[in-house]
């Protein structure tokens, strides 16, 4: 992973410093837990994609850092809220806010991160604000639809639509906002659409192979619908191939190489 992110190491270091300034500046008695949650072995996949595409599209704009911050704050807030809905006790080998403080304080902590994101959004363009509003709404509707279908073995199309709405949107939103700053290669959005869907399905497969908490929570995923891990893995592989084909129009560079390697690393080569 270090080799993959090396070309954007400076951008990621700046991002971490900016994120700490935003998250840790407010007086919040849960701040030590929030700091651990936000800064202990983070993946930062969304900011990494944003910075790589910014380099590929030669976007030199201070809003790139803001878009990465907003995307990560919304993603982090969604994790806290997901833990409440799923009644999860641990995340990344640490107690969740829900487990440690109960649903009321956990909701507020997630809302706190959302408020920080909204504050940042207010300093962007009108188009970027509309993009985030649209995608956040779709994500929430996806969560509502998932809960409506709990304990129902739905068809594959319904599962894919739910997965796209609930999870893929939080990958897509940052890049859609970024692409609004460039007149070139806006068709690259289809790359992240295919990648994000594959990424979540792979997570569902990993969950099915390990603790099966999705099934316990009444959330039936692709391995259950197919009754086959092999078919589910093939589905992910096909989405990965489709995603990588979308990069053929991009000229070769260290950033494109990192993008390809990141997709392979996270989805399986």
PLM feature segments, named:
Residues 6-9, 122, 164, 233, ...:
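Short amphipathic alpha-helical segments with heptad-repeat character
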Residues 15, 198-201, 243-246, 262:
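Amphipathic alpha-helices that form helix-helix packing interfaces
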Residues 24-229, 264-267:
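Mg2+-dependent prenyl diphosphate-binding active-site environment of isoprenoid biosynthetic enzymes
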Residues 202, 221, 237-244, 256:
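Short amphipathic alpha-helical surface patches that serve as generic macromolecular interface elements
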Residues 254-269:
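Short, amphipathic C-terminal "tail helix"
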